[in-house]
């Protein structure tokens, strides 16, 4: 699966070694894993301030995604995705706040992937993807589709534009265990050294959309 539904927090430490032992001996430390990381993140990571804004909440502009990664140390990104009848998956906030550094989902993926491939020892990227489907928030050129349709389109584009060997998926974490939860409890999250240069795609959704995705997978 390309998109990971994250059910547990990724920050915080679980038993990472503490103080040294007697006579200055240090206890052996647990190797760092994915869930030990804390990272800088941006919301509406693609956002450009509109020329005219109905609210002060829209008055900010983010650097392009690759600049955020390269110069600001951002490793967590949040991307809103709409389905457009003419152009497929588009990225913007809403019809009143549509400025974006990467107009399509493909643009966003390509921008981050180019940076990732040029810096392949980076800490893993957490890419939160929020599908937008509400008719009252859709722009004129946006047509609402069935929830399962936009979810499948998102997975298809991730699979097409982001190499499988550069992603961490639920199957990777689950391993040989029957469920993702059992995999985490028994084997733990992936090691940091094994996760460098990769990305985790996380579905940011609740309610019917989240339930539908879980039922389908």
Predicted regions and their residues:
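Catalytic cores of phosphodiester-bond hydrolases, prominently lipid phosphodiesterases
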Residues: 22-217
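Secretory targeting signatures
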Residues: 1-23
